[in-house]
Regions:
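N-terminal amphipathic alpha-helix/helix-capping segment at the start of soluble metabolic enzymes
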Residues: 1-18, 130-136
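Conserved, mostly hydrophobic/aromatic
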Residues: 19, 43, 91, 105, ...
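Short, acidic/polar
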Residues: 22-33, 75-81, 151-159
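Alpha-helix-loop-beta-strand connector modules within alpha/beta enzyme cores
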Residues: 51-72
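Active-site beta->alpha loop and helix N-cap motifs at the rims of alpha/beta catalytic domains
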Residues: 66-90
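Non-cysteine beta-strand/loop elements that form the S-adenosyl-L-methionine
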Residues: 93-97, 165-172
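Conserved anion-binding
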Residues: 93-161
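Single conserved hydrophobic/aromatic residue that forms the stacking wall/gate
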Residues: 173-182
Length: 182
């Protein structure tokens, strides 16, 4: 299986430089993929990108050595599994507020017996290689977004979830009101 470059960099303690794609365009994905980023995140939550746009963007990124990631719009297993099947090598999941939500997210990214991801990585096999299923659980990055007061209060239990690789903390939403930062 194609190695997840940024997962390796993280395990070696190296910094990772990640770009962000919110415009549904293969041209912008191609331009960004040739600018020296270690990874690019396709934003399916607050960007203008949906699955029909994300797939050709993933194909474009895959022609380079940049690791493709996606921020999904919700902790919805079907969407998570589908974008992984399309060749995404990591997921950023928004609005993870407790351990149960973190477990649901991580398990959607992993095949049985570690999770409940269904098997259908048509594009994942093309991009990742013929042994994709054997190594996918270990190679896929799983990041939870910490965006609520509840998630801050339960941060230790969220971080204890086996298979979770890291977190993104969004301070704007962890305050009682987003207006507090205005």
């Amino acid at each position: 299986m194609r190695e997840n470059k940024i997962k390796k960099m993280m395990s070696e303690g190296k910094p990772v430089i990640n770009g962000w794609l919110q415009i549904p365009s293969t041209v912008s994905a191609e331009a960004m993929a040739h600018q020296g980023w270690d990874s690019l995140t396709i934003d399916m939550q607050h960007g203008l990108v949906d699955y029909s746009n994300a797939l050709p963007m993933l194909q474009t990124i895959s022609s380079t050595n940049v690791t493709p990631l996606a921020r999904v719009n919700w902790n919805e297993p079907g969407q998570i599994m589908k974008i992984l099947d399309a060749g995404c090598y990591g997921i950023i999941c928004p609005m993870v507020s407790n351990k149960e939500e973190a477990e649901k997210f991580v398990q959607a990214c992993m095949y049985p017996p570690n999770g409940y991801r269904s098997f259908g990585p048509v594009r994942g096999l093309i991009y990742g290689g013929s042994d994709y299923a054997k190594h996918a659980d270990q190679e896929m990055l799983k990041f939870a977004m910490i965006e609520t007061k509840e998630s801050l209060d339960k941060l230790d239990e969220i971080m204890s979830v086996k298979g979770l690789d890291g977190i993104y903390i969004c301070l704007l939403y962890t305050s009682p009101s987003p207006r507090d930062f205005g």
